Amino acid sequence: MKVLSAAVLSLVGAAAYAGPITTVPWNGHPGAVSFTFDDSEISQLNNLGDYFEKNQDIKVTFFMTGGMNAGNQSKYFPMAEKGHEIGNHSKTHADLTNSNNLKGEITDYKYDLEQRSGAEVVAFATPYCYYNDAVEAEIAKAHIVNRNCQGATKYKWNEEPVWERISSDCYQGNTQQSKGNMSEAKQKNAWTVQLNHGVDGAGFGYGITPSDMISIMDEAKAQGLWRAPMGRVAAYYRAHFVIDKAEATSIDGGFKVTWKSPHSAMPKSVPLRVNIEGAEGKTVKQKGKEIQPEDDGAFVIEFMDLELEVVGAAPASSSSEALPESSSDVIASSDATVPTSSADVPTSSTTAIAQDLQWASQEPTTFAVFSVTGVLVKSFVATTQSAEGSFKALQIPHGTYYLKDLKSNYIRKVVK
């Protein structure tokens, strides 16, 4: 045995823990779908209004343009108060790739819609689905997502898309294809976007009958999909790629996680369903307000608060007592020992832990897991007999670590 060098121990510094927050995919559903309706064709409200009233679990996006049916827009604005979305479809519905006024067509019209509707406008839809680099750059200035129509792409949870090129399935008479998109989204645990125009069966081949439209939306419900507006799903999706990477830092009596908004045009409120490692039995707070867990143990937090605190231990796989408040508490002793020979180090498991007589205590104790460079990775409470299983259960990368018994101060080299 030898003493772990002071140089290694000094590397711990201020404790930091990676990724204690994990977003629940698609708000707790097996997939998501956004139904979008273009051009303020009044048949959309006339023929689907009752359906939306009776089915409050579906919310859609209405993309509006000043170039088509602008006189109907005021009839759509109250839908935003009911949870539906007002989206930007450009000022004149022109081919934007040939426009010399992209700011007026895209950004200025967004603010015009917001002023008249009182709603946040965060999603854009390119007219005719025509775009180029200049169009995308202008869209990205004030919108978090853009819809085009290159087909029913299925966007998987952990694969970040190009936000200015979210493709959709433009309905052209094939109801069975649209229904198939719903089952495929569930199968792939993915998000898909549907594009519709008139809901009266007319519309130069782009219209759909009310019964067919309702049957597609009902199919989405039958598949268990999250049926939410495009901007809302995009905000949830974008938030996931940020918050799941956010690191926690130790604070007095617990830990704090902070993150940044991925875009200046994010909605003012982005409710996010998350799991928080190390929060069981602790108090979760945002801006001083306590967040109660849901029945399944998840938390619905406000992403746009950009921070979260857990009063209690730092993230751990299990804990029945408070963890050390700082890394200096964890490694206060300089006589901690580690094995000196490879024979003492397990090559594929931690079975050697229980074999060491120095680790024979039956009493629960706190174990700290360090990287080989001395960085504190995780902590957990266990007896020496259960330490092996607890260590294996940790969600950390495979590799070599040092496992320290904080009661005896012994350190053991282990492999996951």
What are these model-predicted stretches?
Residues 3-35, 43, 47, 210, ...:
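N-terminal pre-catalytic segment of deacetylase/amide-hydrolase enzymes
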Residues 19-25, 55, 60, 68-71, ...:
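C-terminal domain-boundary segment and adjacent tail
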Residues 30-33, 42-43, 54-145, 149-166, ...:
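Metal-dependent polysaccharide deacetylase catalytic core of the NodB/CE4 family, i.e.
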Residues 290, 354-361, 366, 376-396:
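Glycine-centered tight-turn motifs at strand-turn-strand junctions
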Residues 295-316:
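C-terminal beta-strand-rich structural cap/linker in extracellular carbohydrate-active enzymes
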Residues 314-351:
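Ser/Thr/Gly/Pro-rich low-complexity, disordered linker/stalk segments of secreted
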